Amino acid sequence: MGVTGFSAFPCCGKNSVNIVERKNDDYHHHHHPLEDNKDEDNEMGTELSSMKPPPKVDPDPVPHLEDMVTELTSTPIPETENPEQQNYRIESIKPYEEELTTTNTFKPRGFNVNSTNKEEEEVVCGHFRSTPVQTSKHLFWSNKLIQASEHSLQTALEKHHKSPGEKKSISIAQVYTECTQRPSSTQVSRTPTPTALGLADLINFASSLAVASSSNMALPNLGTMIKGTSEKAQNTSLDFCQPIQSIKFTQATQITQISSEKQDEPPEVMAHKSWTQETRNVACSYLDINESGLKKATIQGEVKFVQAPATSPELQEDKDDSVPGTKKGTPILLKIHFKLSSPQAPEK
């Protein structure tokens, strides 16, 4: 029907057709890549153009962002931490202040208690040093803490034991062991002298210490109260350890008689002139019954040893009313509780 093959195109040969087709193919093949390349270049250009402005714009916001980051890291965090810490501190300070207030309110109470105890002790000591006189019954009441020393007590014991007319002696430890059953009696402390001492002689010695160490002149003025009375000794008994044990003794205590010339002098002058050789001998030894110039009086009472610390500042000081010539290193405190009464004249 139709003519096929190359003979159908009389105006075109095989070579021409092939060349044309190749040229067209090459043109098309080369043209499309160029267009594609141009399109890609245009796209890349647009992309580059779109990418290039951000670097120009980025330097401005980037410092702001860094500043904001630094501000966020520096300022807001301490602001958020400080209120918490401040609140925590405030909450912790309040109970601490309450504890301080409670402790401060408690300490003055304890101090007040101690001060009241000290005041009570001072009142008690003042009571022990009081020396009222009962003129109606001619009795003298003395309850006083006397400072003696081991040296003065030992010398007094030696002088007393040398005397020929020595009475039956009772050891101090024995006296206090017998008195332990008494509820009001205090526990006996250790005495540095192991030698035995009679109870009456001990009270006699204590009374002589009371006479010698009295700062006021009321105690030596007892000579005026017993002046003109009978010189005979009166036997009296004292229940020393009532009601369990009772010790009966007879003792005449002698008190220095002060002349009327010294009584007329003021107390200040008498206090300076009171320490004569006679009073010193009386203070450091037992009173001799046979000594002239002395009056007799009946003593009634008890003597207790009080244990005190050796480092006490009150004991280390030399007081005006302390016994002169005594050692303050090893003091012995005697709690004297006795009465002195003038012997009554015999009834006619």
From Swiss-Prot:
One GO CC annotation: perinuclear region of cytoplasm
Transmembrane segments: none
Sequence positions bearing Phosphoserine: S149, S152
Protein name: Spermatogenesis-associated protein 32
Region described as Disordered: 27-61, 308-329
Tissue: Abundantly expressed in testes. Expressed in germ cells, but not in Sertoli or Leydig cells of the adult testis. Localized at the acrosomal region of the round and elongated spermatids at stages VIII-X.
Record key words, sorted: Phosphoprotein
Entry-linked InterPro entries: SPATA32
GO terms, biological process: spermatogenesis
Keyword hit for Phosphoprotein: yes
Gene Ontology molecular function: any one: actin binding
Organism superkingdom: Eukaryota
Positions carrying Phosphothreonine: T330
Comp. bias intervals (Basic and acidic residues): 27-36
Pfam families: VAD1-2
Subunit annotation: Interacts with syntaxin-1 and ACTB.
